[in-house]
Amino acid sequence: MTNKIYNLDKTNIKDGVQCIKKLWFNFHEPIIIKDNPEFHKGERFGLIVRENYGNGLDLSDNFNIQDVVIKTEEALKSKNTNVIYEGAFIFEKTLVRTDVLIKNRDGWDLLEAKATTKIEEKKNVLKKEYLLDLSIQTFILKQCGVNLKNI
């Protein structure tokens, strides 16, 4: 059994809101799907996001969560880092990974990038699950002391 530095992550929380049994199975009988097409679609979309926001610290290929948390903390303090891709934050043993953090004049902007093929009729309305996603990230980042200015 591995000794994880976190118990919950954003996906577990969202799954638990959707269905408590799903959360239970995620913890007690997890299924690991290595060739999930959705995962690969997300990888490709991540490349497009990085092309649009330019050079920055890209932590997307690092799956050692403790290492990613440390590198994210260092990048937040660095004067040379303006963009962080796939940063990691842990508060109260709850993990979130952010898609993009962009340094602005007096803090950081949080960008949640979504790869979707559905076109919403109401263009300016965020889907409920996106709001939950951003709410979880915002709470954890603020608890970790990140000065968020725009979400």
Placement of each model-derived feature along the sequence:
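Mg2+/Mn2+-dependent nuclease catalytic core
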Residues: 76-151
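Metal-dependent nuclease catalytic cores that hydrolyze phosphodiester bonds in DNA/RNA
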Residues: 1-107
